[in-house]
Amino acid sequence: MYSPLCLTQDEFHPFIEALLPHVRAFAYTWFNLQARKRKYFKKHEKRMSKEEERAVKDELLSEKPEVKQKWASRLLAKLRKDIRPEYREDFVLTVTGKKPPCCVLSNPDQKGKMRRIDCLRQADKVWRLDLVMVILFKGIPLESTDGERLVKSPQCSNPGLCVQPHHIGVSVKELDLYLAYFVHAADSSQSESPSQPSDADIKDQPENGHLGFQDSFVTSGVFSVTELVRVSQTPIAAGTGPNFSLSDLESSSYYSMSPGAMRRSLPSTSSTSSTKRLKSVEDEMDSPGEEPFYTGQGRSPGSGSQSSGWHEVEPGMPSPTTLKKSEKSGFSSPSPSQTSSLGTAFTQHHRPVITGPRASPHATPSTLHFPTSPIIQQPGPYFSHPAIRYHPQETLKEFVQLVCPDAGQQAGQVGFLNPNGSSQGKVHNPFLPTPMLPPPPPPPMARPVPLPVPDTKPPTTSTEGGAASPTSPTYSTPSTSPANRFVSVGPRDPSFVNIPQQTQSWYLG
């Protein structure tokens, strides 16, 4: 659900940053140890041995603090989503000790009961929310089936859905008290490995092979009492600590962080982590009316109440935090004045776009434009050579006339026919798309045929001997009928002459 990469910007949410120092480091070891044991049992159909379990425990305890904090950040993000929006502020204030404990209600499941979540990625075991709260903030080693051992305080008004850690307790039964005495007594006389019996216990055994009374209690875990108490009280932000200071984060005033120390450098994130970050952002947009406490003086990198630009960051585009904290990112570092102007522009719900054909991932602030400016700039250096420029307004008429000027003139004046009667030469239309074709072959040599030239007078006036029109030429033409005035120009074959129904003709009269 959340990015498995290093701490991305969605994991710097003020909700997470305020609660992260209060998470016990033992929670990471405990949840992962239970998952390892369950996976081993499903694969080998037998329980993990003490040596193997102890090796897994030592491996988890020696894990890097950054890995533990990333896991805690993802789990806190899941818990934030399961807490009702109107109770999230109270949850942060009560856990951090800035407000008396009050009920914090969670979103119920379909049956109206406490929800269950998986605390690890791709885990098949689910845990109740109240169990997770107790393990996470109190470090109590509870199993996933210990939900009935939890009790709510009398001050809790809604025991069914309240996930306030200060309202949740663990009931200790008589068996627990009874076993605690013997286990503690055995632990005080033994080393850090309670499963290894001491020499005194071996000597006290009867000769007939029966075990002593104290040896009937077998410690199933690999933690001793003192070790368990010690590791359960260690916060997850202790030890070597993270590579950033939690007090340097931009947040609201109720986090009691210094407003002057609001500068930190974010690790550079690739476009892949930005794309995956959008998936986690979508889960936070389904709860309207949330974040009533994000209206402080400073603006958190993950807060989405003051500007919608945090939810609208596209892959490959710099977020407001990336533009401000660009010491380690791929973008060039802007000046303080440019940083303030860019931050103001982001709060006005503008989305930056990198325009122009020369835009590169390493863009400077001068290439960042907003929708108020023209999107399309002047053309770049591409296709600027005059030899390869092409204007769509130019036609191929000049090209045809250049290749075969005679054919171009004949094609525009006389239509010649092939033996099949289909037209090949037509008048060139500059408005129609002309394909790039070779010039047509020259027309066949036709025998000169005298074309009848009609008189300007009707045929009846020529028989009456009337005077001809002065503008009409005086030719002696044989008398022909009007039907024979349609003449076809074709090859020398006489069968194609004067056959109007088979060829294309022009009216010359």
Swiss-Prot record:
Q: Which residues bind DNA?
A: 1-194
**Ranges annotated as biased composition (Low complexity):** 189-199, 259-275, 296-309, 329-341, 469-482
Can the keyword Phosphoprotein be found in this entry's annotation?
yes
Sequence ranges of Pro residues compositional bias:
435-457
- Motif 9aaTAD positions after renumbering to this chain: 394-402
- Alphabetical UniProt keywords: Activator, DNA replication, DNA-binding, Methylation, Nucleus, Phosphoprotein, Transcription, Transcription regulation
Q: Where is this region: Disordered?
A: 189-211, 259-345, 352-371, 435-509
**Sequence positions bearing Asymmetric dimethylarginine:** 389
Q: Which domain of life is it from?
A: Eukaryota
What family is reported? Belongs to the CTF/NF-I family.
Description of how the protein assembles with itself and partners: Binds DNA as a homodimer.
Written domain comment of the UniProt record = The 9aaTAD motif is a transactivation domain present in a large number of yeast and animal transcription factors.
Name of the protein described by the UniProt record = Nuclear factor 1 A-type
Give me the gene this protein comes from: NFIA
